[in-house]
């Protein structure tokens, strides 16, 4: 099985090293094409206004000045000697759940693999803070992902669907199981933090607050909060089919 790895945290990210160890438990034919720099939050964006610069690190490790989407295209269309059987994207530092999947470069890497006709999985690891220090239990994803991915590959899933895996913030032995979940809903609270530089000119940092919102029992959020691994199937068809029919009826046209 040939596996292509990418991420959005960049070629030097610890989560990418974790992902490679996971992949090597599944196959010896593992390739890495990852961004030169952090591409978090760039979602499914492409680089169209400047050239893509590819740097070969060794026989199977490449860094690209581009987005996760660019990396998957480069891997499938140029770097690999043949089509991969699986694209793995991650392991992201922090969960990618609910509405956040629309911003996620990690999920986008798997999305692009799916668009190219390759089975694809995004992996993210929840974490916590101790003071100002981020504590990421990478060992949890590393311990549980290989067997879970193997089982998922054996079971298979439809074309046009990618799988979004999130691992809870706990030790490997404290994981309480696996749940197949729905994409949850977060309270969206985007904020701008305005500051001044040394010359007095304004600049801004974008950040997100988290308001309280009901959490559905079958959601990815509920699974992670309960200490379970969340497996969420996501499809590329964004059509709201029920609303399509309703709009057709309201307009008196075929839908």
Swiss-Prot record:
E.C. number: 3.1.3.5
Source organism per UniProt: Brucella suis (strain ATCC 23445 / NCTC 10510)
Superkingdom: Bacteria
Function summary: Nucleotidase that shows phosphatase activity on nucleoside 5'-monophosphates.
Binding site residues for a divalent metal cation: 8-9, 40, 92
Enzyme class, broadest EC rank: hydrolase
Keywords linked to the UniProt accession: Cytoplasm, Hydrolase, Metal-binding, Nucleotide-binding
Gene Ontology CC entries for this record: cytoplasm
Pfam family, one: SurE
Keyword Cell membrane belongs to the record: no
InterPro entries: SurE (IPR030048), SurE-like_Pase/nucleotidase (IPR002828), SurE-like_sf (IPR036523)
Catalytic reactions of this protein: a ribonucleoside 5'-phosphate + H2O = a ribonucleoside + phosphate
Keyword Metal-binding: yes
Subcellular location: Cytoplasm
Gene3D superfamilies recorded: Survival protein SurE-like phosphatase/nucleotidase (3.40.1210.10)
GO molecular function, one term: 5'-nucleotidase activity
UniProt record similarity statement: Belongs to the SurE nucleotidase family.
Cofactor binding, note field: Binds 1 divalent metal cation per subunit.
Protein name, per record: 5'-nucleotidase SurE
Cofactor(s) required for function per UniProt: a divalent metal cation
